[in-house]
């Protein structure tokens, strides 16, 4: 049957199944083994646990809760609001019986996409069929209702944010908040000599903010509470390191600062991810070197409450799923919540809540500036914070290059800050143990209730919304029933309740976009349902989030209308780690497949319009790198790296990637998302890694009638100044052909400088073309002469792993 593109929203309801007879049949040898295992360990006998799923072709897009002990007539009555961007011939409803090891297939019902594509409501009983498409015993049927809304029926499609009345992303746990203030941070620190002149509306110039200085001040000035969550928190790092900007008390480590505040009576609570691999004797640092046990030991016996927090599964999953979640997934939110003085109320005792959200963990290797030096800070700010996990045996005693760190963070003030605190309270209540959260009700005469910090008339005011990827295994207070969950903007699964609003926020922002999108992210992979079956079975990958496909479909829709639209994506050269290792190569392989899927969409759309244009004028990928000539008086290491290693080659060539750890998207210079979530399935799933993000805009700086010139525009221009080493008039309009051609041209030139044999000057900027080619049909190819990243034997296009399960690397 012909496949149709379903791009929009599918409203689906699964009511009930009538007249089921007997269980389903397990297939083949494995089925017999599972039956024997169940009999031996005494599980899976007796009760039925029936649930239903919705698939668009082979992509799972919804699932009901389990109904226990209703073997004949299970009634779910569950409704789903499904974002779709899938080619499909059928919408498939599958009924299964769950058990601790896996699930038994009862049967499947099919509704052809032809029936829903025109938008009419379909409400019918559909026959349930077996694997051979014959009716199952007893002729059972499932009652479902479907209605499809094409993306162009959405009144926000292609419109951007039309006015200050824009209500935010619908169907989410947290509503959009008005009257907020946001500070945007590029990198952990900005030195005084980073001063791009970027004009904003109202005759102002953009002023960069300093993240770790502000966090230091916020912690230092807290009087009642300091709440911190992190993937990693390392007690031994210093937040203040710029000798030209000293602060009173700034020479302490964050661990000592938190102990001091706790001893003064401030409630200091830390939730740090418990890396389950870190107990393994063979992995003294854990796979990811998070220092979780060192941090716990540092605070033991002090007034600081530090909880190591495993990523526990929500209750009720199969044994296999539970093992996957607790050993493979992480707590990834990076937040700081403090009480703070009231702005401009001299002498007032009243306090408010201020929160920080973004990509920067308070740990080693994160302190950096937009200059991202490889060698020149090794005797100063990075001497005791030398981070280089991409080479075996790298150490300060052997010298650079260190791994520079590019990241983005935000400070939130106003009602939105309380939402971040509520997220912490939900997580602490679930996994923190003792009930020692500060009872704000008892402090109501000191800490104000959530209230605006700015009037809506103020030209600097923000509207902000909080988004998460999290489930009931990590947050308390989620409703039990699917109806209540849907009401609260949550998604109900087979055995868990999920907040997946970060993915929703990205989808919404992409669909609204008018002119351009600028993405910086540590990972870029997904929409595996649309990947080519080149050596893989796409439905086995399960990296099902929509973001890459939504981006390519947005470009396609603009090409079809003859309108301009550009997408710029910055990723790291490779994911942190040994670049030739199996996991890094597997992720690069998924990234290549994602890029290829997108470029094929773009090229097909151009061909359909009779255009033979360079697809990089619509969609373009970059990475960041630095290269420095040797200067007199530079740090001289006592030892050398081993000969003929990546480390030695990089040291001799004086170059290395700048690690892009950011998780940010800017749309039309008017809307920004900043958080902890990567563009991969782990971060976007909701039931894998736990994440948090903000999405916001300034209602007085929309790109409705003229280009937006508020803080978001200033922030993007400041980032481009950091990456390109220059400002240019063409950068003011990223949607123009002149702009994308110029940025591509500069990044091509910088890649040539970066990868050349000899080096006469420092690299003039950091933005490098991502070193791939795009063939005439959209296939991703090697750039001539670049099978491997410079100084390595690691393939740029990646290598499919035959032993690592996709759930680990997607």
Curated annotation (Swiss-Prot):
C2 domain is a calcium-binding fold, and the binding induces conformational changes, promoting the protein association with membranes. These conformational changes occure at millimolar Ca(2+) concentrations. Also binds PIP2. A lower affinity toward calcium can be anticipated for PLD alpha due to the absence of two potential calcium ligands. Its main location: cytoplasm. It is an enzyme of class 3 (hydrolase). The gene is PLDALPHA1. CDD domains: C2_plant_PLD, PLDc_pPLDalpha_1, PLDc_pPLDalpha_2. This is Phospholipase D alpha 1. Residues 327-366, 656-683 form the PLD phosphodiesterase domain. GO terms for biological process: abscisic acid-activated signaling pathway; ethylene-activated signaling pathway; fatty acid metabolic process; leaf shaping; lipid catabolic process; phosphatidylcholine metabolic process; positive regulation of abscisic acid-activated signaling pathway; regulation of stomatal movement. It is found in: Cytoplasm; Cell membrane; Mitochondrion membrane; Microsome membrane. The lineage of its organism: Eukaryota, Viridiplantae, Streptophyta, Embryophyta, Tracheophyta. Disruption phenotype: No visible phenotype under normal growth conditions, but improved resistance of the seeds to deterioration during storage. Insensitivity to abscisic acid for both promotion of stomatal closure and inhibition of stomatal opening. Hypersensitivity to hyperosmotic stress. Increased NaCl-induced disorganization of microtubules. No effect on abscisic acid-induced stomatal closure. Pldalpha1 and plddelta double mutants have a suppressed abscisic acid-induced stomatal closure. One of its GO terms (molecular function) is phospholipase activity. The keyword Metal-binding applies.
């Amino acid at each position: 049957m012909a496949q149709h593109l379903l791009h929009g929203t599918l409203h689906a309801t699964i009511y009930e199944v009538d007249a089921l007879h007997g269980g389903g049949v397990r297939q083949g040898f494995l089925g017999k083994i599972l039956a024997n295992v169940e009999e031996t360990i005494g599980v899976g006998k007796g009760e039925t646990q029936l649930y239903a799923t919705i698939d668009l072709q082979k992509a799972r897009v919804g699932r009901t809760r389990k109904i226990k002990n209703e073997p004949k007539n299970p009634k779910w009555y569950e409704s789903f609001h499904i974002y779709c961007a899938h080619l499909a011939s059928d919408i498939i409803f599958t009924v299964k019986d769950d058990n601790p090891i896996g699930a038994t297939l009862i049967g499947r019902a099919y509704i052809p996409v032809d029936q829903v594509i025109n938008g009419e409501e379909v409400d019918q009983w559909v026959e349930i069929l077996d694997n051979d498409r014959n009716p199952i015993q007893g002729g059972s049927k499932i009652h479902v209702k479907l209605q499809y809304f094409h993306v162009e029926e959405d009144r926000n499609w292609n419109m951007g944010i039309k006015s200050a009345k824009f209500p935010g992303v619908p169907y989410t746990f947290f509503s959009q908040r008005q009257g907020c203030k946001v500070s945007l941070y590029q990198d952990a620190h900005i030195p005084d000599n980073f001063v791009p002149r970027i004009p904003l509306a109202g005759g102002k110039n953009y002023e960069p903010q300093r993240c770790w200085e502000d966090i230091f001040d916020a912690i230092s000035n807290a009087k009642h509470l300091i709440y911190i969550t992190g993937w990693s928190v390392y007690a031994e790092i210093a937040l203040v390191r710029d000798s030209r900007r000293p602060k009173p008390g700034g020479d302490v480590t964050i661990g000592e600062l938190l102990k001091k505040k706790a001893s003064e009576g401030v409630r200091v609570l830390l939730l740090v991810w418990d890396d389950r691999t870190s107990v393994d004797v063979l992995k003294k640092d854990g796979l990811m070197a998070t220092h979780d046990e060192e941090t716990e030991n540092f605070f033991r016996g002090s007034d600081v409450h530090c909880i190591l927090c495993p990523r526990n599964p929500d209750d009720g999953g199969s044994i296999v799923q539970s093992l996957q979640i607790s050993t493979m997934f992480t707590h990834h939110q990076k937040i700081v919540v403090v009480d703070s003085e009231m702005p401009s109320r001299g002498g007032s005792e009243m306090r408010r809540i201020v929160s920080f959200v973004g990509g920067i963990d308070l740990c080693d290797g994160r302190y950096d500036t937009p200059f991202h030096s490889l060698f020149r800070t090794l005797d100063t700010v990075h001497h005791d914070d030398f981070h280089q996990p991409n080479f075996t045996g790298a150490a300060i005693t052997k010298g650079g290059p260190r791994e520079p760190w590019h990241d983005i963070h935000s400070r939130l003030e106003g009602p939105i800050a309380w939402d971040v605190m509520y997220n912490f309270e939900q997580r602490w209540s679930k996994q923190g143990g003792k009930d020692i959260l500060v009872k704000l009700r008892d402090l109501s005469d000191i800490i104000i209730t959530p209230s605006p910090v700015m009037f809506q008339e103020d030209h600097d005011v923000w509207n902000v919304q909080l988004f998460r990827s999290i489930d009931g295994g990590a947050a308390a207070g989620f409703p039990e029933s699917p109806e209540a969950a849907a009401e609260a903007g949550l998604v109900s699964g087979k055995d868990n309740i999920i907040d997946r609003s970060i993915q929703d926020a990205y989808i919404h922002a992409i669909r609204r976009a008018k002119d351009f999108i600028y993405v910086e992210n540590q990972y870029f992979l997904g929409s595996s349902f649309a990947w080519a079956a080149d050596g893989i079975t796409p439905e086995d990958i399960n990296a099902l989030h929509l973001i890459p496909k939504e981006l390519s479909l947005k470009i396609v829709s603009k090409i079809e209308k003859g309108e301009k639209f550009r997408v710029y994506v910055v990723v790291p050269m490779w994911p942190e780690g040994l670049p030739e290792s199996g996991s890094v190569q597997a992720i690069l392989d998924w990234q290549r497949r994602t890029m290829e899927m997108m470029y094929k969409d773009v090229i097909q759309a151009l061909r359909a319009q009779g255009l033979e244009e360079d697809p990089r004028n619509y969609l373009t990928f970059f990475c960041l790198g630095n290269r420095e000539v040797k200067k007199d008086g530079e740090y001289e290491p006592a030892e050398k790296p081993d000969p003929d290693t990546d480390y030695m080659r990089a040291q001799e060539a004086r170059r290395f990637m700048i690690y892009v750890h950011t998780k940010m998207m800017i749309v039309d210079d008017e809307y920004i998302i900043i958080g902890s979530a990567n563009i991969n399935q782990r971060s976007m799933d909701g039931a894998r890694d736990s994440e948090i993000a903000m999405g916001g805009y300034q209602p007085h700086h929309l790109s409705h009638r003229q280009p937006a010139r508020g803080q978001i525009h200033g922030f993007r221009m400041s980032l481009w100044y950091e990456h390109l080493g220059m400002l240019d008039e063409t950068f003011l309009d990223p949607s123009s052909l002149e702009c994308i051609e110029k940025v591509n041209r500069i990044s091509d030139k910088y890649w040539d400088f970066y990868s050349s044999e000899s080096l006469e000057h420092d690299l003039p900027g950091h933005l490098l073309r991502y070193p791939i080619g795009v063939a005439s049909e959209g296939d991703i190819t090697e750039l001539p002469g670049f099978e491997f990243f410079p100084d390595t034997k690691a393939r740029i296009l990646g290598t499919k792993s035959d032993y690592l399960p996709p759930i680990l690397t997607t």
